[in-house]
């Protein structure tokens, strides 16, 4: 089992935290365990409340069912069902930017 450094950033929220996330745990779950307050609703990859945008790195979000191919190509990620596949940086609180 690999573990990756996931950096969660959002200038407006004053967020810049790096956490270690195993490749078999969701980013949102580990962030919560570390005391980082991120938005969420369904926790099942079926809405956009937890949306973030990948700035660098790779993630696996094959469990999600909400984002379309264009949104995924643009780098959007649902943190509630995203596993890290490399060290990565994610801009959080991106639900409004999706639309």
Swiss-Prot record:
UniProtKB keywords: 2Fe-2S, Electron transport, Iron, Iron-sulfur, Metal-binding, Transport
Keyword Metal-binding among UniProt keywords: yes
Function: Ferredoxins are iron-sulfur proteins that transfer electrons in a wide variety of metabolic reactions.
Domain 2Fe-2S ferredoxin-type: 4-96
Gene source species: Halothece sp. (strain PCC 7418)
Cofactor(s) required for function per UniProt: [2Fe-2S] cluster
Family annotation (InterPro entries): 2Fe-2S_ferredoxin-like_sf (IPR036010), 2Fe-2S_ferredoxin-type (IPR001041), 2Fe2S_fd_BS (IPR006058), Beta-grasp_dom_sf (IPR012675), Fd_pln (IPR010241)
Protein name, entry field: Ferredoxin
Tree of life domain: Bacteria
Membership in a protein family: Belongs to the 2Fe2S plant-type ferredoxin family.
UniProt binding sites for [2Fe-2S] cluster: 42, 47, 50, 80
């Amino acid at each position: 089992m690999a573990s990756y450094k996931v950096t969660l950033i959002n200038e407006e929220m004053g967020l810049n935290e790096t956490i270690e996330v195993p490749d078999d745990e969701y980013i949102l779950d580990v962030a919560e365990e570390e005391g980082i307050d991120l938005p969420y609703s369904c926790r099942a990859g079926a809405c956009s409340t937890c949306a973030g945008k990948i700035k660098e790195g790779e993630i696996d979000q094959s469990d999600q069912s909400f984002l379309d191919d264009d949104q995924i190509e643009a780098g959007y990620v649902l943190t509630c069902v995203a596993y890290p596949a490399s060290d990565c940086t994610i801009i959080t609180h991106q639900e409004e930017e999706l639309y």
